[in-house]
Amino acid sequence: MNTNSNSSNIVAASPDAVRVTSSQKIDIARVATRREHDLLGELDVPADAYWGIHTLRAVTNFPITGIPVGHFPELVRALVLVKQAAARANRRLGYLDAAKCDAIERACELIAKENRFHEQFVVDAVQGGAGTSTNMNTNEVVANVALELIGHAKGDYATIHPNDDVNMEQSTNDAYPTALRLALIFATKPLTDAVGDLAFAFKTKAIEFSDVLKIGRTQLQDAVPMTLGQEFEAFSVTLKEDIARINEAAALFREVNLGATAIGTGINADSRYALLAVEELSRLTHEPMVSAANLIEATSDMGAFVLFSGVLKRLAVKLSKISNDLRLLSSGPRAGIAEIRLPAVQAGSSIMPGKVNPVIPEVVNQVAFLVIGHDLTVTMCAEGGQLQLNAFEPTIGYCLLSSLRQLTEAITTLTTRCVNGIEADRERCQSLVENSITLVTALVPTLGYEASSRVAKRALAEKRRVSDIILEEGLLTADQLDELLKIEAMTRPSRAARLVAKP
């Protein structure tokens, strides 16, 4: 084995796995190595690493976020499924012999199905080169796992080569975008499931609070009565809408440019390859993947990413608004609105005893802000593409996969740690309604606008209830007032006010 006394960004995390980090360096002489070469020369690669020289150079070049591709299991799975589909297509075309294809397929299955070797995907998620570093990291890992499966040493590329065999008839410019689209499809399902659970939780609370009358508010001022159930029902409905919008946007990712190779012309690929590779990818993923009608357009266009990112931003905005509402409605406990109580999940202050803060809605707000920022980044990356290729897909992928993960976790946390445990303060809601001047709005059809305005002004000035003044002035009888102030009459379209005659 070769050794090298120079420092490197390579860390032996365990005897059988070498990890790369951007923050730690050790002397490579401490680990056994193998010599690999590329067009720039030779380097020593840790013998235990399943990645090779191309990955090593990428790790050195891009110590950007400290977040490796392996942080996103959906992307790792998608990358190797693309390699497996390509291997199958090339075997059907007679370009890849059965033994090599079988070894590559077995390697891909270990990574995709058994979640092994994900720690070997070590290049930074944000990188130059339009994803070439990620693609080569994948090629090298698949090749070296395949080599070991057939009894050969890592680095024996004369037997199975990362480029000639694993990357056969591919370019980064079609393999990586296809994998990214597939990864986003995989990551979307957990998000929509989480949104569905949250919508159901709000619906459940809407039923529980259907008889709790409260004051609705516009511009933070008292408006007209509604039920707390109606307020929570609105949260449920708006979230359910976004499940359909997200799925519609994600469906665009089923159209891929696999077979386009470098710029969409399909150079170096068999004319039959694209359709066969997409067919095999559909079979492996159980997704109805299709080949883009125009591969040149599909290679350069980022429209699907921009649309999907916008839908995620839409969801984030809704979640942030809902979180704002939960924080406002629970403000107090004695000097705020205090119509609802959020579950107490941790102490709120290091100086104020007994204080409990709405930390779950607060973290959802912050996740929403991150997603909104990611959307702007995706927009700029998409706009920054030039001519036949967009070099910024790695950052598009990083932003979208991060948004999906963060939204999924935030929504799940909001459901389980907050919404499921929300309680209504029924007495507080009733007190606010009874003392609200806005009750007079429900009486306008009966009393008229001018009389109602006079009652409201007097109630405000004298700090008295609207109902007391109406009875005092003889504008309505107690029975008539009770009829008009029934929960049904005040919280949905009703003819009651038209049918009650003035005394």
Q: Which residues does each predicted region cover?
A:
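Conserved, well-structured ligand/cofactor-binding cores
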Residues: 2-503
